């Protein structure tokens, strides 16, 4: 069975989580790729094939408010609006959009991306593809183009470390990435989501072109006490008094989502937590 991607005709779901594919018509296999979350990796010589795995990273995603949430909500609502889709089609354009999130580590960029991607999966029968390496991006993208040729599900592509794909160590030149975002390698009915901790490393020709990334949004720490309370309360309300949790929420203002979650986990595990640039936040001993 070949994994040549010239003419995809069948997909085989293996017990180890990998999805094998064939150029042959086969009996009792799927002729289209199931809606789901997948990781892509190209295996060089001697295998020389795309490795497609069903992603096991399907943690429960709860998204919290951030300053530009309404902007993203409206963008996704508009993307799936039937009138908008028809208008774009009438104009002869590909229906595609990109969003790039940036900010320091732990601000919840990946959580936000996953939340929107999984909504497309669940509400629109979408296909979500994660790139796992900056090597052989072109090989994996050619595979995605073959998927697009045989089915019309909305496709969401996630680059979690966008800066990695514009480094000199990347096997694929920056120019190829541009053609994916907005060029002869673009595909229809596609949403590209990227995240980076190092926005200054992203070339202006990529981050400042709305046709490549419609929105480039800074995701900061959480400054709303109420929102921090919403995060902490379901996690530690059974082991902390309401007044304690409110005090913790005040002390955690400006911290990242990751730091807040870790604070709660430390409390659950009876560990001492510290906040950067703030006084140490101690706990009463576990009973």
Name each region found by the language model.
Residues 1-91, 95-106, 112, 116, ...:
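AAA+ P-loop ATPase mechanoenzymes
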Residues 163-166, 178, 182, 200:
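Catalytic acidic motif of RecA-like/P-loop NTPases
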Residues 121-152, 171-174:
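Short glycine-rich substrate-engagement loop in P-loop NTPases that contacts/grips substrate
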Residues 204-221:
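A short helix-turn-beta junction within AAA+ P-loop NTPase domains corresponding to the substrate/partner-engaging
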Residues 165-174, 186, 203-206:
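Conserved ATPase-coupling elements of RecA-like P-loop NTPase cores
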Residues 218-224, 229, 233-287:
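Conserved AAA+ ATPase small/helical "lid" subdomain
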Residues 176-191:
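Substrate-engagement module of ASCE P-loop NTPases
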Residues 158-160, 190-197:
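Structural recognition of the conserved hydrophobic beta-strand(s) that form the central parallel beta-sheet
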